[in-house]
């Protein structure tokens, strides 16, 4: 948490989006440390209020990710967090949700990046992406 805090403490983060489910662990702790709100990105049917969703391709099919419709506003600076970057498709879909909500700016963080993961094909090139460890 300390290392992530040092990276993002001066970025003006107002919301941290943790991606189901391992992104909740450090994402929630990081949101608390940054003094930001925490938003869960979850699979369909798990959030209690009205949601928006994005469907994305996986290696063997498709999947869908949702956030609450009112979780992010136009003045928010958002950090999207997940534990592992493999294909990047889940993160890319979550990033599109944050864009649709009108966030002012978004950053992306993974704890671990698998080398040769294809990040450039799935997450827009202009998005600042950080990882703590590459394998």
What is each residue range found by the language model?
Residues 1-135:
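PRPP-associated nucleotide enzymes
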